[in-house]
Design a protein with these regions (language model features):
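Short beta-strand/loop motif that positions the catalytic acidic residue
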Residues: 195, 201-203, 207
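The serine-hydrolase catalytic nucleophile loop
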Residues: 1-8
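Catalytic active-site module of serine/aspartate enzymes centered on a nucleophile-bearing elbow/loop
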Residues: 224-251
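Alpha/beta-hydrolase
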Residues: 101-190
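Conserved alpha/beta-hydrolase "acid-adjacent" motif
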Residues: 208-214
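Conserved hydrolase catalytic core segment
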Residues: 53-97
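Conserved alpha/beta-hydrolase
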Residues: 10-30
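Conserved acidic catalytic loop of the alpha/beta-hydrolase fold
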Residues: 37-56, 66
Length: 251
């Protein structure tokens, strides 16, 4: 889900937050040809190992589809799901999937769908540049960001957290990033309509990395969804509301 809330915030909420690297990121081994739905088995294994019977899930940005997968596929274990700034399935009927999306994300996803070998080469080169200077990658996002995102990322602490997050995710290779892009553009392996646990879909109205229309479309597919779209807020605004979403998850 990206940079985590401070320990003091979690303590005051009474939340035990367990995060993990998806396959190919950080210290996790790659799982080639994985689907979004494959995450449910990983989460189940972690919960069983820690003797956690019931739990909520939260995912931001690329973690959003994976949180939804857990909600759909682990109904006897998952209590609630919080999803912040997530894309919808690429085959979403009636949704103009690329409308309002940043040029860089359009290029990444169209390449993933049409020319996977080119994606591997392109993201591999980009990952090498990020590993060499992760802070500069944060700066390169600026021209595509709406003003509300620039305001969030102007905070030096946030910039440092994002840079550390990028560096850790790519410390071994770009495999996780590549496999995520491929999985997002393929069938996810579950149906949103099958979700029966409460889901909060949080989204910034001005998001250009995963447009708000995606959240609105998913809200129409998930029978238990609560949609919250904030005006004058974009993708990185999710970092500021994670404590609020955590509070919702433990109701």
């Amino acid at each position: 889900m990206g940079p985590l809330p401070r320990g003091r915030v979690l303590y005051e909420l009474g939340v035990r937050l367990i995060s993990f690297d998806r396959p190919g990121y950080g210290g996790s081994d790659r799982m080639a040809s994985r689907l979004v739905s494959d995450v449910a088995a990983d989460v189940l294994a972690i919960a069983n190992h820690l003797d956690i019977e019931r739990f909520a899930v939260i995912g931001r940005s690329g973690g959003g589809p994976h949180a939804l997968a857990c909600a759909a596929m682990l109904p006897d274990r998952v209590t609630r799901a919080g999803v912040l700034g997530s894309i919808a399935p690429r085959g979403a009927e009636g949704l103009d999937w690329y409308a309002g999306m940043s040029e860089s994300n359009v290029r990444e996803f169209t390449t993933a769908a049409a020319a996977p070998e080119s994606l591997i080469e392109e993201l591999g080169l980009t990952a090498a540049r990020i590993k060499a200077d992760p802070m500069s990658h944060v700066a390169t996002l600026g021209p595509e960001m709406p003003e509300s995102d620039r305001r969030v990322v102007a905070d030096g602490g946030i910039r440092m957290l994002l840079a550390k997050n990028f560096a850790e995710a790519l410390r071994h290779s770009a495999a996780g990033w590549i496999d995520d892009a491929l999985a997002f553009c393929a069938p996810w392996g579950f149906n949103l309509a099958d979700i029966q646990v409460p889901v909060l879909l949080w989204h910034g109205e001005d998001d250009v990395f995963s447009p708000a229309a995606h959240a609105r479309w998913m809200a129409g597919q998930i029978p238990t969804a609560e949609l919250l779209v904030l005006p004058h807020t974009a993708h990185f605004g999710a970092l500021e509301v994670v404590p609020d979403v955590l509070s919702w998850l433990i109701r």
